[in-house]
Regions:
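Extreme N-terminal starter segment of soluble prokaryotic enzymes
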Residues: 1-3
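Acidic-histidine catalytic/liganding microenvironments
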Residues: 22, 63, 122
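Hydrophobic/small residue at the entry helix of a nucleotide-binding pocket
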Residues: 11, 15
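N-terminal FAD cofactor-binding segment of flavoenzymes
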Residues: 42-85
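Glycine-rich Rossmann-fold phosphate-binding loop(s) that bind the pyrophosphate
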Residues: 7-10, 108
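Conserved N-terminal helical subregion
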Residues: 74-154
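Glycine-rich FAD pyrophosphate-binding loop
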Residues: 6, 18-48
């Protein structure tokens, strides 16, 4: 049995690394990604920034990912939540909860490059990039994926 992940953006790359870590490379993972992460036109790793909750950062640390991106993160100390047109709002301060940060902000391009470096050394992970899916065949017992280059993954 193996796992085939199509799409190596933030979610797919993180899933592949998590499976590798949690199974110690014993469950083979094929990650298929159409665009190299260093490409300026990568749709998942562009110049956008995302906010990660502190709990997410802690989970990423548990599976060995956060350590690779932490030096490029910016801590979130304050969160202001309001609803336009309504009187209510709330402001959360990390110091009120005696924590360093409520979360972290990271730029997707930096994260993508670092995730793909981790993927290259992740036990049990085979990276197919750049590669595209040509067809998927299903049976009661299995699924196989044929890539445009002729490689068949099952």
């Amino acid at each position: 049995m193996s796992v085939i992940i199509v799409g190596g953006g933030m979610t797919g790359a993180t899933l592949a690394l998590a499976i590798s870590h949690l199974t110690q490379g014993q469950l083979p993972v094929h990650l298929v990604e159409a665009v190299a992460p260093e490409a300026s036109n990568h749709p998942g790793f562009d110049a956008r920034a995302i906010a990660l909750a502190q709990g997410t950062c802690q989970q990423l640390a548990r599976i060995g990912i956060w350590q690779a991106i932490a030096d490029r993160a910016t801590a979130i100390g304050t969160v202001h939540v309001s609803d336009r047109g309504h009187a209510g709002f709330v402001t959360l301060e990390a110091q009120d909860y005696r924590i360093d940060a409520l979360g972290q902000v990271v730029e997707l391009h930096d994260v993508g490059l670092r995730l793909f470096r981790l993927l290259q050394d992740a036990p049990g992970v085979t990276l197919h990039c750049p590669a595209r899916v040509a067809s998927v065949s299903r049976s009661e017992a299995s699924v196989s994926v044929k890539l445009e280059n002729g490689t068949v993954l099952d």
